[in-house]
Amino acid sequence: MPSALVRMFAALCFIVCLGGPYSGAGQGVAPVVQPVDGVTTLLRALQQAAAAGDRTALLALGDAQISRPSFEDFAATVTTPPPTRVVVTERDRAPRDAGVLRLVVEIFTERGIEGRLGTWRIDARPGNTPSDPWRIASVSRLSVVTGLYRLALDTATEYDINNLVVRAPDLTIDVPSGRAFLASTPDGPTAMVLIGRGRMTFSPPDVAERIQVHILSGRDELVEEIDLAFLRFSPYQFGALIDKNALKTRTVDSSDVRTAVGVFNELAPRSLQVDLSDISRDRWSLSPGFADVIAELRTKRFGTITYARSSSEPEDINVFDRKRRRNISIYTSAAKLAQRGRFYSEDERLDYDVLAYDIDAQFMPDRSAIDGNARLKIKILEDGTSSLTLKLAETVAIRGVYSPDFGRLLHLRVVGQNSIIVNLPEVLASGTELWLDVRYTGPVVPQAFDREAIQIAQGPPAQDQRIEIPLQSRYLYSNRSYWYPQSTVTDYATATIRVTVPADFDAIATGQPVESPTLPPGGGDNQRRRKTFVFEASRPVRYLAVIVSRFNRLDNARIPAGSSDVSLYIQSTPRAPVRIRETTERTAGILAFYASLLGDAPYPSFTLAMAESDRPGGHSPPYFAVLNQLLPGSTIVWRNDPVNFENFPSFFLAHELAHQWWGQAIGWKNYHEQWLSEAFAQYFAVLYAEKDREGSLPGILRQMRRTALEASSDGPIYLGYRLGHIQGDDRIFRAVVYNKGAMVLHMLRRLIGEDAFFGGMRAFYQQWKFKKAGTDDFRQVMERAAGRNLERFFAMWVFGSDIPRIKFTSHLSATEATVRFEQLGTVVDAPVTVTITYESGTVESVVVPLTEKQTEQTIPLKGRVRTITANADNAALVEIER
């Protein structure tokens, strides 16, 4: 079985549907139906010979000129040892020279409880006369899936449990007494049902993970009573995982059998299950990888909790609640952490890289449907690659996957995961480049503004009133909707996008508009007439996005942005309240300011779409941004969100524009690193506020510090999207990743100085532009800029969640003030402002860098002192005690 498929099935516990490759999405897709003809008769004869294990009869189907070695190998594969059942399914046919038809055929063979699915390319040649039978002229294997098992519980053998203890990394299952049943493959037991009262103990070593467990359960360990368990494991691990002395055979009890079979039938299909419904009615599954374990544990408080150890995953321990779609704990085991270290990139496991996209998509807004044709230029990264996994919305039907080099290709649907696996007809070497053409059609639900945008959507509004005026419909297809076939992770590539919409709609997409929208000549119903927009992304982008709505083109401008200019376009929905000149000037000013800090703008054009809405927010894909505009008369007020800065209304705009640099030009290596996008965009909005409106910084810092302190106990910045995930409260995510992250950058700036900070930020941007970075990459750049080690700073503020407590005292003499700081806990690096207010009303601020257990500094005085305070400017994430 290809390694990509093993990782897909075994590591991620997916349920897949091996449906017809050209017939559409969904489970149990019917195979291509061909008329009864000479080819059909040939395939029936092939199936009969294979099912009978008759190698001689199968070889008799070959043409006289066929390559005997390859044909004999094929015959041996499907007949030896004799199968118990064979299904031959034609998937595609295409004409070749001299009347030859090239067939794509799947052959499924069962031998006992083991199954094998092979995909073969067969050239069939007609006989010399119409009455002569067709013959096999050549045969070659395209792909094979082995290790399929028709698992069933062994109800003939029941075991008494006597103090059974099952251990997996950071998990212990104790069952003092009860009943057990096994399900086995020829290699040994691979599944177990445990019936009886016991206890599960999940104890993650990582502090951040223990915090998440505490949020769920009220304690740092998840210790829960259970009454049944279902386990999956490698047959080769059974002896190490299960103490056989704890299992004693006993007389089978029919009541226990009914219970165990019910548990097995309910829980076994949840993992490693393969749906072959169009060729077999049986349930087929794969075995877990060596050292992998899946445990479904039914608890009293939380229902069924799933533990999965998937050794091929970068974070190989996962505990989650399937029913509520809630991740409880995801982290790297101690063994893997010792081998690899903390940092990793999601790209490390990729078999290929997408270099370019060419998308032609027709949108039907009234049905939220897409008819698309996507071409992908792909470069193979790993030797031996025989399949490619792509992301694409599960709701669409795939009309076909093609390659100019290989013709029509088979694909496998991954149910529930918005994924397809494309089988290649041969193993490809690293460095090979090819084009894929994916044709698809069907509904795709538009994407809601998500956590990557500043969406004020949590908590009750101050006044619960509704706006009765209907809002202009808008349909956003971006990084979460999988509206086009793409890599399994965000992946930098260039792109050309052609978007066709009804004549009364407009479109904005990733890329520079290259021509005015075209409209077919003639009149008629606007819903039937359509127009096409074309966009060119000449510089690499992480993902592609489209928004379809009714837009008015308001303004455009050319902006100097560092080493190059940017074409700016302003558009809005019809009723969005927009001050055109002010919006253009402010947007241009923000873009130019950011470019002055970092050296350039990443993309040659930018479109700002202003959309009417009942709440603030926005979304910023490459090349454009959508910014919500509150309709006049709206009485809904969202004051309790951490990122709602009412005294600086341009903050949303500044944040979204900053994403063109942070989040788009520079991406993040994995979800832990999302602060490199959100916190950086947030802090650049702070920098713009500091420049644009004198006196705005203290209020912004005060709100950021307050909300960061309130939410810090929920976990560190490095936890990413999982902050607030268990509680279902996105405000926690925004308070920590947005606000605390921005505060960390502000503290870093004050710790290392202006020149080092801004020089380091520019160097980081220029070095990592159009690549994905991590916290360690950022730290190393800033260390070079500052000329000092910053490991402790990042360990505390990015990877830690504690808030330091610092005791502050001061002593005044006639000419100087002596200030002393004592860190009451672990020593951290923190710059703290000492504010001296003189009786004259003059205020002096001095930044004192704290890097030791005790810090003392003498400050010359300029007059009689009224007060002396520490951290009055709220610029440090510390608690000051007097």
Predicted segment positions?
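Hydrophobic alpha-helical and helix-loop surface patches within well-folded domains
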Residues: 22, 418, 535, 567-823
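Extended, low-hydrophobicity, Ser/Thr/Pro/Gly-biased non-transmembrane segments
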Residues: 227, 233-351, 437-551
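Non-catalytic accessory/interaction domains
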Residues: 290, 298-338, 343, 349, ...
